[in-house]
Regions:
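Nucleotide-activated chemistry modules centered on ATP-dependent adenylation/adenylyltransferase
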Residues: 1-10, 15-394
Length: 394
């Protein structure tokens, strides 16, 4: 007997992907393999196995990618100071390339003819996933249910779930939940009342940060050590990449650090509103910029700042594996070996304040910058410098 074709579905165990699982089974004569990338999201392994097995799935894979995600994706992005449209630290964007890469690995392992994802037809993630799929498995078919099925709204999904006895989760108010994406780097919340920009975000949707009103009335100090541009220790203790970020998430979250409410311009051309929490990532971004300010020369820093918007846009748009992103990463990392030292941050009710910078490889000269008299800086050269630049105004 000829074996069935196989489809590998990026599966979370939640409502959307459980519906997609059932839909694939109904519409394709194929075995569906459920694949979950553990990148530090709030994962319920029992729920994933329970919900998939209810629908007759035999192969359920949960792959631990937390350290790979932080070390090979988050850290390079932090080194590039990637911020989209001034505030977004790209927490969802940076996760998709790794998931797509590993999903294709599983597809090849099982000799699957297709992969599938749960991204909506209006979102950026469909692009991010499918660019990753193409890079690693250009001959593998992509099935994107949201672009082809007849279920066009959340209401349609809920009705389909009821019809097929698929568990429908509830939020804290007992209603169908917001659209939430999370990983060890961030949590995003979208949909429902947030779709109207005039509505403020209710406090109960925040999962990893307290409000400034509930944060301690006393500031906290956190020390982050860097080696070759990457964090290696928090408050003097070394951690693995995922544990280090988890530690910073806890410290920042309890001090109300890392909340962003953003109306962003999606790659596909529409605007969307999302509420993001990136507590540990916010600390890393502040600390990394601070340590670079005393270890890198002016030209290197300015070149990095010049390319940053494009670098961030490439990540946002799903071009992590593009030649252009690789090229910009080489520029970003050109002098990372000099970025060593420690930064202390003071945290208070959502604020992040640089407390101190300490390094043995400093590009900062106290003698040259001092207001006291010194012989290391020739002031007569300044007049010639100014006269030269006056010519540019003629």
């Amino acid at each position: 007997m000829k074996s069935k074709k196989k489809i590998v579905l990026a599966y979370s165990g939640g409502l959307d992907t459980s519906i997609i699982l059932k839909w694939l089974q109904e519409n394709y004569d194929a075995e569906v393999i459920c694949y979950t990338a553990d990148i530090g999201q709030e994962i319920d392994r029992n729920k994933i196995f329970r919900n998939a097995k209810k629908l007759g799935v035999k192969n359920i894979i949960i792959q631990d990618l937390k350290d790979i995600f932080v070390k090979d994706y988050v850290y390079p992005m932090i080194r590039g100071h990637a911020i989209y449209e001034g505030v977004y630290l790209l927490g969802t964007s940076i996760a998709r390339p790794l998931i797509a890469k590993d999903q294709i690995r599983i597809a090849k392992k099982f000799n699957a003819y297709a992969v599938s994802h749960g991204s909506t037809g209006k979102g950026n993630d469909q692009v991010r996933f499918e660019l990753g799929y193409h890079y690693f498995g250009p001959k593998i078919k992509v099935i994107a249910p949201w672009r082809i099925w007849k279920l066009k709204s959340r209401s349609d999904l809920i009705n389909y779930a009821k019809k097929n006895k698929i568990e429908i989760p509830k939020d804290k108010k007992g209603a169908p939940p917001f659209s939430v994406d999370d990983n060890i780097f961030h949590t995003s919340t979208e949909g429902k009342l947030l779709e109207n920009p005039k509505n403020s975000a209710p406090d109960f949707i925040f999962q990893r940060t307290v409000s400034p009103e509930k944060a301690p009335n006393k500031s906290s100090i956190v020390k982050i050590d860097f080696k070759s541009g990457d964090p290696i220790a928090v408050n003097g203790k070394k951690f693995s990449p995922s544990k280090l970020l988890g530690k910073l998430n806890y410290i920042a979250g309890k001090n109300a650090v890392g909340r962003v409410d953003l109306v962003e311009n999606r790659f596909i051309g529409i605007k969307s509103r999302g509420v993001y929490e990136t507590p540990g990532g916010t600390l890393l971004m502040h600390a990394h910029r601070a340590i670079e300010s005393v270890t890198l020369d002016k030209d290197t820093m300015h070149k990095k700042e010049k390319i940053m918007p494009r670098y961030a846009e490439l990540i946002y748009n799903g071009y992590w594996f593009s030649k252009e992103r690789f090229k910009l990463q080489r520029i970003v990392d050109l002098k990372r070996s000099k970025v060593n030292g420690s930064v202390k941050l003071r945290l208070y009710k959502g604020n992040v304040i640089i407390h101190s910078r300490i390094t043995k490889s400093s590009a900062y000269s106290m003698k040259k910058v001092s207001f006291e008299e010194n012989k290391t800086f020739n002031k007569s050269n300044v007049e010639r410098f100014i006269n030269f630049h006056k010519k540019k105004l003629k």
